[in-house]
């Protein structure tokens, strides 16, 4: 594993001995990455082109130091064009173990819509290892599919959208909530989805392309296909929101899904 260039080591050492100090007076919770490091004298631009150039890739995420966490965040922002104004630096002044223990909701609270993106990337590293980045184009395509299906913008998440989650009716910004609400709204469903076992939370996609078209219309994404949508649905297996069912087009709500049970609506 190649070592970091001298300029990066100097910069990271500076970060370690200043911004990571628990009593750093200028570490405003609302301060963004660009606020902290806009001066090139203290924040020379990273030249990462691939993950293997980054030192954080030599360590399992649970063993990352605060410096590794910072480096990983910077890589994600550079590689996937995340708006750094969405991310509060102080919210990620933590170790890798603390980072890995964060839930998706905590990522969203810490970084808005960027938080969903970061959570998705971290979970892929934890399950696939750094091989997730071996094919840069493939990893970008995977993340792009997730972004397309969850109203994220791969061309750059705008800061005004950082906390724009809506969880009402069929306007929910989470795909699984949209599916849930569609199941609970016969007047909107039009035979697109149907329950197979209401009590167990098992349902079937009857009209796959119609579902993709409706979701695309809700998110103003005319490129949405069921292939992309189903990839995003399968991602929910990792979070416990959906559970795998060994039948085509059939899904089941998991332990972390809410609002679908008749007695808990």
Swiss-Prot record:
Tissues and organs where the protein is expressed, per its UniProt entry: Expressed exclusively in tissues with a high content of epithelial cells. Highly expressed in salivary gland, mammary gland, kidney and prostate. Weakly expressed in placenta and lung. Isoform 1 and isoform 2 are differentially expressed in different tissues. In the kidney, only isoform 1 was expressed, while prostate expressed both isoforms, with levels of isoform 2 being higher. Expression is up-regulated during keratinocyte differentiation. Several epithelial carcinoma cell lines showed lack of expression.
Pfam families from the UniProt entry: Ets, SAM_PNT
One cellular-component annotation, GO: nucleus
GO molecular function, one term: RNA polymerase II transcription regulatory region sequence-specific DNA binding
Gene3D superfamilies: Transcription Factor, Ets-1, Winged helix-like DNA-binding domain superfamily/Winged helix DNA-binding domain
PNT domain ranges (all copies): 43-129
Keywords, sorted A to Z: Activator, DNA-binding, Nucleus, Transcription, Transcription regulation
Protein task: Transcriptionally activator that may play a role in regulating the later stages of keratinocytes terminal differentiation. Isoform 2 binds to DNA sequences containing the consensus nucleotide core sequence GGA[AT]. Transcriptionally activates SPRR2A and the parotid gland-specific PSP promoters.
Protein name, entry field: ETS-related transcription factor Elf-5
Taxonomy of the source species: Eukaryota, Metazoa, Chordata, Craniata, Vertebrata
Name of the coding gene: ELF5
């Amino acid at each position: 594993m190649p070592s970091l260039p001298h300029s990066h080591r100097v910069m990271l050492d500076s970060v370690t001995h200043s911004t990571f100090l628990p009593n750093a007076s200028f570490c405003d919770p609302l301060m963004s990455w660009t606020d902290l490091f806009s001066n090139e004298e203290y924040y020379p631009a990273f030249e990462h082109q691939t993950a293997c150039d980054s030192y954080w890739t030599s360590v399992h995420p649970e063993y990352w130091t605060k410096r590794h966490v910072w480096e990983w965040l910077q890589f994600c922002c550079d590689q996937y064009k995340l708006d750094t104004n969405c991310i509060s630096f102080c919210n990620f002044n933590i170790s890798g173990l603390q980072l890995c223990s964060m839930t998706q909701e905590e990522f969203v609270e810490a970084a808005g819509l960027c938080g969903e993106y970061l959570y998705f990337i971290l979970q892929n590293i934890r399950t696939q290892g750094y091989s997730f980045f071996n094919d840069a184009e493939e990893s970008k395509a995977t993340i792009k599919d997730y972004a397309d299906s969850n109203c994220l913008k791969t061309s750059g998440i705008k800061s005004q959208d950082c906390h724009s989650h809506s969880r009402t009716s069929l306007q929910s910004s989470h795909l699984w909530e949209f599916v849930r609400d569609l199941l609970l709204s016969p007047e909107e469903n039009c035979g697109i989805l149907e329950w197979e076992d209401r009590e167990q939370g098992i349902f079937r996609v009857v009209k796959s392309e119609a579902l993709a078209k409706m979701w695309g219309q809700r998110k103003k994404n005319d490129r949405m296909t069921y292939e992309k949508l189903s990839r995003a649905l399968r991602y929910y297996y990792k979070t416990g929101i959906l559970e795998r069912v060994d039948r085509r087009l059939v899904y089941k709500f998991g332990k972390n899904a809410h609002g679908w049970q008749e007695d808990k609506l």
